[in-house]
Design a protein with these regions (language model features):
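Short acidic, glycine/serine/threonine-rich loops at helix termini
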Residues: 132-137, 171-172, 233-243
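A conserved short coil-to-beta-strand element within the FAD-binding core of flavoproteins
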Residues: 37-42, 224-239
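Conserved N-terminal/central alpha/beta ligand/cofactor-binding core
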Residues: 48-52, 137-222, 226-227
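Core beta-strand elements of the Rossmann-like FAD/NAD(P) dinucleotide-binding domain
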Residues: 93, 247-256, 260
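Short, well-ordered alpha-helices that flank and scaffold nucleotide-derived cofactor binding pockets
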Residues: 24, 111, 115, 213
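N-terminal Rossmann-like FAD-binding beta1-loop-alpha1 element of flavoenzymes
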Residues: 92-128
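Extreme N-terminal leader/targeting segments of oxidoreductases
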Residues: 2-95
């Protein structure tokens, strides 16, 4: 698989134009391109009289990739695939790991642990997305704040109501894993290649709900309106957490706590 960077095309260009430009960059007949996938698409509008699209693409070609690379310029490189595979954990404890918070970190921790078969218990002080949306609407319309379920607390975390702009200043290759999981759970497909990916608050609610459903389907449990008030520690080891849920108090036994 080869990656071609910075293919510049007019705003009127279509998929065939992109394939032809990719063939030109590789210095081979476009018919030798078996597959082409856009990994980034941006608009260059620095010159108002010359606005164009800029693409990065990954292509699978018919031929010797090393030979093709030798005759191409610096804009072509071999794709460095980074697949996120959680390390194998040989866990002997029969206690469920507890995740505190169901924002972005809690959701992806829950997904990873549930897929690994650990059936995590997730505690979230706020409400699930359906009730949380009602609480937020009440605050915006009537200025009545629910201190436990609002734009900050609740399923999905603060990002659920931040319009879903996916920007980061880091180049961590695992960002691709996050983007793909969001798309797999209902976010627009174009976030996979857009230079400024954007989900939108309406679609984010669906994504968050679908992640919750997968975790539960794999044996995980999510307790909403349930606040962790303390960690139980004895002899330097975690033995559990203390929780409060609508005036009811419970000690949950665990030896693993993720503060998310």
């Amino acid at each position: 698989m080869l990656k071609i960077n910075q293919i510049k095309l007019p705003l009127t260009a279509d998929e065939h134009d992109l394939r032809r430009a990719a063939g030109k960059a590789l210095r081979l007949d476009e018919n030798r391109i078996r597959t082409l996938r856009v990994t980034k698409k941006a608009v260059d509008s620095r010159k108002k009289d010359n606005i164009f699209f800029v693409y990065n693409v990954e292509v699978d070609v018919d031929g010797d990739e090393n030979a093709i690379l030798k005759r191409c310029g610096s804009g072509v490189e071999t794709v460095k695939k980074v697949d996120f595979t959680p390390p194998e954990v040989k866990r002997t404890s029969e206690l469920r790991p507890v995740i505190v918070g169901f924002g972005p970190a809690g959701m992806f921790s829950g997904l990873a642990l549930a897929r690994a078969g650990f059936k995590p218990l997730i505690l979230e002080r706020g409400s699930h997305i359906e009730d949380r949306q009602k609480d937020v609407q009440t605050f915006w319309r009537e200025r009545r704040l629910n201190p436990e379920s609002n734009v900050q607390f609740g399923e999905g975390g603060a990002g659920t109501f931040s319009d879903g702009k996916l920007t980061t200043g880091i180049k961590d290759p695992l960002c691709r894993f996050v983007i793909d999981e969001l798309a797999n759970h209902g976010a627009p497909e174009e976030i996979r290649w857009s230079a400024k990916p954007h989900i939108g608050t309406d679609r984010l609610a669906e994504v968050v709900r679908n992640i919750r459903k997968e975790i539960i389907s794999l044996g995980g449990e999510i307790r909403f309106n349930c606040k962790m008030t303390d960690i139980i520690v004895a002899n330097g080891y975690i033995h559990g957490v203390k929780t409060e849920n609508d005036g009811h108090f419970e000690d949950i036994e665990t030896d693993t706590v993720l503060l998310c």
